[in-house]
């Protein structure tokens, strides 16, 4: 049982921060959920958003308990997101910065291959109040990304979204992360 009314106790920024994972689910597998983010009343439809997001995650985890197959999709946005979070995230004594969901939201954008879909996602972020960009030291973020659990032997598996509702895991050299951060070769 999930009681959406408890969300009213959260500051608005935390509420929106949590929605980033639901936006992720919509991009990976649920175009109808994405439509809610584009045009729906988020607060009125929060029960549906929660239901659809949990249904997606439950389905993935039940099919792949060990993260060797489709469960990898849940890492979408997290490779870059965790790098940003390590450098700019709210943690420990650092009380100013970005929350986890905000970092993941930023990490999803470069992994969306369709420019048209990127534009739509940016519009959703604006609508929700998620960040579209943030200033950060790219070298530090890149260095943090090299410590990602998916980085092994100079390779890293990233999740890319070529279009709404579809994704693929792609193993690339870790140097391939640099252009995703907008770094020069």
Which residues make up each language-model segment?
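Glycine-rich, flexible loop/turn motifs
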Residues: 6, 56, 70, 160, ...
